[in-house]
């Protein structure tokens, strides 16, 4: 993999790490919305082997606005092929570790509202080590999708009694630096971050949101 940045990497407060896969239609809008947040000190985009113009769009944005518009550094990390979202998130955490006090993991497809990061940062400053965004408006999804998701969480929570997963919680989370360090030390081949996070035992809070 290789990376390019619009400015030198410096230690910061909160980094946003976003996995990207075939998001050319929305990636520039995503960047703009993240950069509008005063809580964010760095945006790291991890391209997971996109086959469309995602990388071209990001590089074009860097060239056009990197100097004048991006007081927040925007870094592009390119994976050599499509490794999957878990691998992309881990690559981003590896890259960010040691440079910041907290990392926000978020999808770049705008299914997660970047503006919620302000509330996540506030919860973190009040002592939370993990802040998880939980959807509370799943009525627009198909009944089959809602039913299968609910079934998965019920079965998982019955089988694994040492941890409990929340239905509606995805990968949109803020992680403190100690949590990032703990996760990057776990090098499982087939990762399931939703299960690894509660297992680490750090103080966690949840924030509800609607799409």
Annotate each language-model stretch with its function:
Residues 200-211:
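Active-site donor/metal-binding and catalytic loop motifs
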Residues 73-74, 79-81, 85-95, 114-196:
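Acceptor/aglycone-binding surface of glycosyltransferases and processive sugar-polymer synthases
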Residues 25-29, 52-61:
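Acidic helix N-cap motif at the loop->helix transition within catalytic regions
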Residues 18, 31, 40-50, 77-78:
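Short beta-strand/loop segment that forms part of the nucleotide-sugar
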Residues 47-56, 110-111:
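A conserved acidic beta->alpha catalytic loop
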Residues 99-111:
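Short beta-strand-to-loop acidic/aromatic patch adjacent to the donor-nucleotide binding site
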Residues 23-37:
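Short, well-formed alpha-helical segments that are part of the catalytic scaffolds
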């Amino acid at each position: 993999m290789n990376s390019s940045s619009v400015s030198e990497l410096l230690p910061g407060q909160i980094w946003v790490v976003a996995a990207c896969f075939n998001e050319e239609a929305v990636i520039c809008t995503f960047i703009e919305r993240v950069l509008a947040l005063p809580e964010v000190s760095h945006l790291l985009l991890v391209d997971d082997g996109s086959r469309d113009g995602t990388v071209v769009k990001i590089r074009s944005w860097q060239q056009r606005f990197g100097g004048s518009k991006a007081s927040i550094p925007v870094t592009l990390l390119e994976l050599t092929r499509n490794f999957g979202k878990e691998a992309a998130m881990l690559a981003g955490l590896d890259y960010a570790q040691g440079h910041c006090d907290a990392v926000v993991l978020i999808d770049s497809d705008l299914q997660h509202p970047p503006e919620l990061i302000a509330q996540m940062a506030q919860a973190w400053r009040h002592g939370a080590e993990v802040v998880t965004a939980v959807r509370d408006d799943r009525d627009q999804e198909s009944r089959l999708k809602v039913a299968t998701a609910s079934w998965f969480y019920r079965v998982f929570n019955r089988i694994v009694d040492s941890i409990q997963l929340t239905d509606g919680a995805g990968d949109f989370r803020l992680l403190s630096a100690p949590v990032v360090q703990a996760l990057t030390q776990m090098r499982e081949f087939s990762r399931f971050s939703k299960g690894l996070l509660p297992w680490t035992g750090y103080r966690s809070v949840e924030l509800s949101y609607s799409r």
